């Protein structure tokens, strides 16, 4: 499907923003939509890096007051220092695994079998977790200690497997560890900031030479679309979990996994990295 670059940018920006912070795997959706739009060459891969920056900025904007409090509280607030330290601890496992094995994971696991399996298995795990859900022991992200942060970071490493979903791994991991839905979701949002920022900066460093002046307008549209849609998705998810569980996302993952299986079987989408 050949569309103008600005329209490709708008569509992919919306897809990135709407899926980045939901437990559904933005990567899987971007592969599918990028393939359908025929926007999956090196420019397309660079574009994914740019729109991810828009999604990161959206969650920073949503929590701007908390981030400012943390920044100015580091010098005198023990709670601020503890929270930032917990984010660093939670980031380290994925950072180390990504540095040591990121290329190997992309080379060997980025295929339709892996993506299908992780989508469907992830959905089944969410259903299981929600059915066994017990009263939470941790109601606020400020009550997360370094041990919990480390365990949440270990859950985040699972997102290195294509189709798993970084948000899904950390949110469901949080529920298993006794966090409330809101605490698990908000910690996942905050953990996304250093994780996605560093990953995006690294990818941009590797691919930045491909960016040309004629791409700037389309990339700007995609960035803006990702920012707005991610902001709405974050706000919407926080409202949604106030009265619902994650079961709907589980069934969506299972259905999408079947879509991946079908498109791969009939050769409609090249599910490779």
Curated annotation (Swiss-Prot):
Annotated compartments? Cell inner membrane
Q: Which GO terms describe its cellular component?
A: plasma membrane
Mainly localized where?
membrane
Q: Does the keyword Cell membrane apply?
A: yes
Q: Name one Pfam family in it.
A: BacA
Q: What are the protein's UniProt keywords?
A: Antibiotic resistance, Cell inner membrane, Cell membrane, Cell shape, Cell wall biogenesis/degradation, Hydrolase, Membrane, Peptidoglycan synthesis, Transmembrane, Transmembrane helix
Q: Which residues cross the membrane?
A: 46-63, 83-103, 109-129, 184-204, 218-238, 249-269
* Reactions that this protein is recorded to catalyse: di-trans,octa-cis-undecaprenyl diphosphate + H2O = di-trans,octa-cis-undecaprenyl phosphate + phosphate + H(+)
Q: How does this chain sit within the bilayer? A: Multi-pass membrane protein
Q: Which GO terms describe its biological process?
A: cell wall organization; peptidoglycan biosynthetic process; regulation of cell shape; response to antibiotic
EC annotation from Swiss-Prot or TrEMBL: 3.6.1.27
MF annotations from Gene Ontology: undecaprenyl-diphosphatase activity
UniProt family annotation = Belongs to the UppP family.
* Described purpose of this protein according to its UniProt entry: Catalyzes the dephosphorylation of undecaprenyl diphosphate (UPP). Confers resistance to bacitracin.
Recorded hits in PANTHER family, A to Z, give: UNDECAPRENYL-DIPHOSPHATASE (PTHR30622:SF3)
Miscellaneous comment in the UniProt entry for this protein: Bacitracin is thought to be involved in the inhibition of peptidoglycan synthesis by sequestering undecaprenyl diphosphate, thereby reducing the pool of lipid carrier available.
What is the name listed in the Swiss-Prot or TrEMBL entry for this protein? Answer: Undecaprenyl-diphosphatase
């Amino acid at each position: 499907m050949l569309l103008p670059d600005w329209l490709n940018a708008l569509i992919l920006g919306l897809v990135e923003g709407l899926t980045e912070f939901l437990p559904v795997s933005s990567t899987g959706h971007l592969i599918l939509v990028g393939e359908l739009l025929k926007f999956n060459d090196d420019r397309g891969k660079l574009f994914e890096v740019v729109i991810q920056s828009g999604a990161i900025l959206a969650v920073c904007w949503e929590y701007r007051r908390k981030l400012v409090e943390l920044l100015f509280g580091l010098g005198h607030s023990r709670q601020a220092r503890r929270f930032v330290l917990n984010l660093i601890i939670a980031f380290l496992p994925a950072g180390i695994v990504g540095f040591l094995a990121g290329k190997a994971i992309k080379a060997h696991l980025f295929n339709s079998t892996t993506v299908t399996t992780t989508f469907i298995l992830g959905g089944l795990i969410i259903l299981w977790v929600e059915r066994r859900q017990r009263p939470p022991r941790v109601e606020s992200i400020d009550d997360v200690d370094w041990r919990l942060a480390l365990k949440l970071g270990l859950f985040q490493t699972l997102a290195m497997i294509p189709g798993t979903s970084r948000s899904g791994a950390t949110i469901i991991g949080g529920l298993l560890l006794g966090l409330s839905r809101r605490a698990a979701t908000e910690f996942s949002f905050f953990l996304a900031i250093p994780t996605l920022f560093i990953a995006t900066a690294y990818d941009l460093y590797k691919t930045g030479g491909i960016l040309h002046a004629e791409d700037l307008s389309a990339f700007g549209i995609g960035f803006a679309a990702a920012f707005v849609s991610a902001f709405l998705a974050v706000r919407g998810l926080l409202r949604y979990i106030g009265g619902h569980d994650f079961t709907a996302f589980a069934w969506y993952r299972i259905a999408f996994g079947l879509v991946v299986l079908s498109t791969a079987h009939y050769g409609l989408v090249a599910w490779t990295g």
